[in-house]
């Protein structure tokens, strides 16, 4: 995106008719996010990637080489933006961009936490390169949540020097969600240093304030963190707005909070200019069925929002927050020509989409040619483990029965500590399918040290042998759960054979497999194939009686230290609130909790770490 300063003379000349436009959009109904009105009979003249003229008649800017687009009364609205999305999930940026722009979402603000968690600064730069020259534009933030808790976390992160380098790169706007607000309230030196670096660089810092209120929330905001996507109701949203924050109303694949937040805010007419929509991540199935930010706009209107107000929340408000209003967010002279032509203000379905004045979508179909940067070969070699066997999932005991501590799943995401009495056979504590007690294991797949912990999990409910995933927030351990050690090994090995992914094993065979070959978190397959793979993965487990609607999220969230109550990493089972390890065998010592080491370590590229 070229600075406006390089275009001002040309734009002024086109606006005056002294130079001819590259594109004129005629006969459109302009959705003005600045005045809240729809202006019929508008014409828009575009020069290069920016708008030069908006008004009733652009004929003075028409030349022999000007492309004329007759909108036939369609609504011209600014491209939508997703101000907080983790794009390092499921599909490549190229596949995501192609789908997003079909839904009128032309800007994505990427927080690549897992890519950095796997591969550090190299991963950050790689994802940036993969996001260039695509139908939608990408902006980036430096992950602000790694490590979530240095006492237990082993995730990669950026060094202070790398943070400073990153914010000097084009399209890097600042820092992503700062997960652990307790690190701010306790003035953790590393966290405060990183925040200071961002503030000194004039950067945006995004927030994550789940569970914070009162003086704790004030302390967090006082550090210059001015947005949050974690409010789940209007009361939480209002508390943050009153402290000067911006609120991103989340409507994505993991949580949908819009219906709880927006109606009371509309009734009060409070803080509407500081509300945005975000997904926080969206999977291919949801994208295909619901859409992207266009879905949020439809929902907002259904909940009572004026259509133009909803469009402003999806566009102008986002760029106001990111201090980019001079360039993006609305249709006016000087701004980038990210324009979508909507059939109506009910479906918000775009017929045509222009990004930087170039037509990316025509007649509802993608017409831009893509030449995406491919993931480098090292991204397919991030699993540094050898073949696993049933013995690698053993929990040893000399007794006939053992009392064990368990992770009880309340939802796909929420856990609590439980306990169970299990039988011991040939020195191995066994899971109990009858009692819905599973084994769960986390393996270090990145460093090559072979560390792992094996524990127990309750309330998964599916009649399967095992589920394995190389993608997990934000440690990216290889997480395996199952009712059979043999099938757990088979599922884990199936994932490793693909270079990463999610696998289900039933009755000794792999019944569903979603390859995630790029760093073990992103698929190199086309969007449609990934969507089909995720759908099959889900249906196989729900048809087998799984308790949850999105079973793949169970291993994804099991190591996630930003949420209570009990988590498992390769270093051990963790009580998040008490910040202490939990013994797998009740009453056993956890003093050092040194991770057990496998002998069959597969050597990989040192540069991954």
Swiss-Prot record:
GO molecular function: adenine deaminase activity
Keywords annotated in UniProt: Hydrolase, Manganese
Record's protein name: Adenine deaminase
Pfam families the UniProt entry points to: Adenine_deam_C, Amidohydro_1
Reaction(s) catalysed by this chain's protein: adenine + H2O + H(+) = hypoxanthine + NH4(+)
GO BP annotation list: adenine catabolic process
Species of the source: Cenarchaeum symbiosum (strain A)
Family to which the UniProt record says this protein belongs: Belongs to the metallo-dependent hydrolases superfamily. Adenine deaminase family.
CC cofactor: Mn(2+)
Record EC number: 3.5.4.2
Keyword presence, DNA-binding: no
Classification via InterPro entries: Adenine_deam (IPR006679), Adenine_deam_C (IPR026912), Amidohydro-rel (IPR006680), Metal-dep_hydrolase_composite (IPR011059), Metal_Hydrolase (IPR032466)
